[in-house]
Structure formats: C-alpha cells, structure tokens
Amino acid sequence: MTRPVTGKDLMIVNMGPHHPSMHGVLRLIVTLDGEDVVDCEPILGYLHRGMEKIAENRAIIQYLPYVTRWDYLATMFTEAITVNGPEQLGNIQVPKRASYIRVIMLELSRIASHLLWLGPFMADIGAQTPFFYIFREREFVYDLFEAATGMRMMHNFFRIGGIAADLPYGWIDKCLDFCDYFLTEVVEYQKLITRNPIFLERVEGVGIIGGEEAINWGLSGPMLRASGIPWDLRKVDRYESYDEFEWEIQWQKQGDSLARYLVRLSEMTESIKIIQQALEGLPGGPYENLESRGFDRKRNPEWNDFEYRFISKKPSPTFELSKQELYVRVEAPKGELGIFLIGDQSGFPWRWKIRPPGFINLQILPELVKRMKLADIMTILGSIDIIMGEVDR
C-alpha cells in the first residue's frame, strides 16, 4: 500500500547545545527538507552569567577578573576595553612604554584567537591534520603570555594607567624569535590549506555576504572586511599607539567563507609586523602612570619610598567615575568590542553595556544557511567565529 503524498515532509533537528561543532553551548533548531536547510533558529543564553549586572556592583579593578570570562580566548581585548573607559573618563595618560606593551599583548592575543579559530574550523569541515600544527604555534604564544603575566589564559594584566608589571628579562628576544618562526609557519598553512582542492570545495561560494548587507546587519571585524569593506578600528580610532606602526588593513571582496579565512590568515601576518615594530622601538620609562594610584589627591606621596618599590604588587585604587556617558571600542579578533559606560560619581558604574562582536555577527546565521545544505551549517558557523562566553555574557 502506497502512502498518499500530501506535501513536503519537513524534519526539525536540534543541533547542540552539546554538539562538538557548536563552539560552546549554542543550540540550533534546524528545519530540513531532506538535506536542504529551510529554516534555522539559534537559541542563546545557556552561558548567561549576568556580566553587565555584576559590573554595577564592582569597582573597575574588582571587575577586571570577570571580563576575561567574556571572550576567554582573547582576554587581552576585554581587559583593554575595561581600562580604556575609566582612563578616558578620568583623562589618565598611559605612559608610552605601557602603550607599546599593550599593543604587543593585544596582537599576540589576536594571533592566539585566530589560531584557535583556524584549528577547530578545519576540523569542522573534515581536515584533522592542520589542527595539531596550529595548536603547536598557539602553545608558543601561551608560553609568552605565561612568562609576562603569570597566566596562560585569563591574564588580568591591564591596569588603569598602564599594566600590572614590566616585561621580564629575555622576553623581548624570545618574542622576536617567535615572530621569525611564525612567519614561516603561516607559509606552511597556506601550502597545506589554502591550495587544498577539497578545502576550497567546502568553503568557496558558501555563506556569501555582500558589503551593503554586512553593514545593514551591523557586522564587524573579519566578517565585514571579507565583504569588501576595509574598516578596522585600529586605523579609524587610532587607540593605543597603532598609528605609530606601518601595517595594512586586510580585506577581501568575495564575502564567502573562503574570504573570511583569507582575511584572518593575513591578519596574523600583519599582527607579526606590528609586534616586531613595537619590540624594536619599545621606549624606556615607566610601565604605569603612578599618579593614577593616588587615593588622596591632596597628599603628595613619595613614590621613591621603600614601600612603593614593588608597586605592581599593590592593588589599584577605586576610581570615582564622573557623571558622564562614554562609548569605548577596540578592534577585537572577532570584530568591534565595545562598552557603553555611564558614571554616577561613585566607584561603581551606573550602567555597563557590553557590545559583543560575536553576538551581533551571529544574527546573520539563519539568513546565510537558508537554501544551503546541512553540512554547510558547520562551515558557515565556523567561519563566523563565535565564543559563547561573549555572546551570552
């Protein structure tokens, strides 16, 4: 007996929140017509921890360890955005040496983030071999972090007015050696991955985003630059000391998953160029603005006294945030990371609104996967590069 055909039989499939390709606790409710994707609904919030509300009950120096749990693979950027806001509100000048060290750490963190994106992205589309090579280089970056900050991840290194401690002896030479080594490894990645016909078959023409569409969706970072828009906040806002270095914005016109891969691969090379220039031109002087540590402005402490010799061990003071509104942003590996800060003449922020790049970039996923194949969901989601810690906050 044959069953009468009354219409298309659509299948609803849950992907996640424990799927290995979900890059965290993301859940997708996918409607399928055979292998074709009809609809896709992302379900968020599994990693929500109330980060914005916590900020309203903490001083900035108390809140710094929390912010490293947003994007826990690029923690230097969350620390930078957290100290940049109060620095601008209080008009605190950062010493040149501290600014250069910040740039070095930010670019090393960008490389580590892109490497940790590239390895699982290749594994998602079936290429297991590059994963191990990529994680080898990532370990070298984490060794540099551990030598400078004491932590491989969650560094808690940035401070209002500077950084927690100066670079240790021999660290600069070790970092320069890594830069020379890593440039040769990027060439190996290009030979192993970029020219691979199977890889090109999986990513070329998949998940295409036009330039105008990317702007309308509010995309940023490699998602925007891969769609033909050369927009980089390091050039636009010129924060820290980025305008003192020579480097180029990396962008592509195609707007597909391959273009996003190429942008991130090229960005790692540009980051190495910035790091090399910063290390070679690293100025002397203090690594923090000591006056920003003054609790009582009327008292002029003797910074050369014995009790101030180990100043990096001392806790920073609680700053009074003036009654102003301020939006601060940095170019994180995943896009524009920003905070909207409202002060209220107290040590705690009245409002701390986070603008996570991953959350906004993820919004276009249902639009990209419609009319694609089920296997393309992994390729497109991987090319977006999300971390659920910052998406859910």
UniProtKB/Swiss-Prot annotation:
<keyword id="KW-0813">Transport</keyword>
<dbReference type="Pfam" id="PF00346">
    <property type="entry name" value="Complex1_49kDa"/>
</dbReference>
<dbReference type="InterPro" id="IPR029014">
    <property type="entry name" value="NiFe-Hase_large"/>
</dbReference>
<keyword id="KW-0874">Quinone</keyword>
<keyword id="KW-0472">Membrane</keyword>
<dbReference type="GO" id="GO:0019684">
    <property type="term" value="P:photosynthesis, light reaction"/>
</dbReference>
<dbReference type="GO" id="GO:0051287">
    <property type="term" value="F:NAD binding"/>
</dbReference>
<keyword id="KW-0150">Chloroplast</keyword>
<dbReference type="GO" id="GO:0016655">
    <property type="term" value="F:oxidoreductase activity, acting on NAD(P)H, quinone or similar compound as acceptor"/>
</dbReference>
<keyword id="KW-1278">Translocase</keyword>
<keyword id="KW-0618">Plastoquinone</keyword>
<keyword id="KW-0520">NAD</keyword>
<comment type="function">
    <text>NDH shuttles electrons from NAD(P)H:plastoquinone, via FMN and iron-sulfur (Fe-S) centers, to quinones in the photosynthetic chain and possibly in a chloroplast respiratory chain. The immediate electron acceptor for the enzyme in this species is believed to be plastoquinone. Couples the redox reaction to proton translocation, and thus conserves the redox energy in a proton gradient.</text>
</comment>
<protein>
    <recommendedName>
        <fullName>NAD(P)H-quinone oxidoreductase subunit H, chloroplastic</fullName>
        <ecNumber>7.1.1.-</ecNumber>
    </recommendedName>
</protein>
<comment type="subunit">
    <text>NDH is composed of at least 16 different subunits, 5 of which are encoded in the nucleus.</text>
</comment>
<dbReference type="InterPro" id="IPR014029">
    <property type="entry name" value="NADH_UbQ_OxRdtase_49kDa_CS"/>
</dbReference>
<dbReference type="InterPro" id="IPR022885">
    <property type="entry name" value="NDH1_su_D/H"/>
</dbReference>
<dbReference type="GO" id="GO:0048038">
    <property type="term" value="F:quinone binding"/>
</dbReference>
<dbReference type="InterPro" id="IPR001135">
    <property type="entry name" value="NADH_Q_OxRdtase_suD"/>
</dbReference>
<dbReference type="GO" id="GO:0009535">
    <property type="term" value="C:chloroplast thylakoid membrane"/>
</dbReference>
<keyword id="KW-0793">Thylakoid</keyword>
<keyword id="KW-0934">Plastid</keyword>
<comment type="similarity">
    <text>Belongs to the complex I 49 kDa subunit family.</text>
</comment>
<keyword id="KW-0521">NADP</keyword>
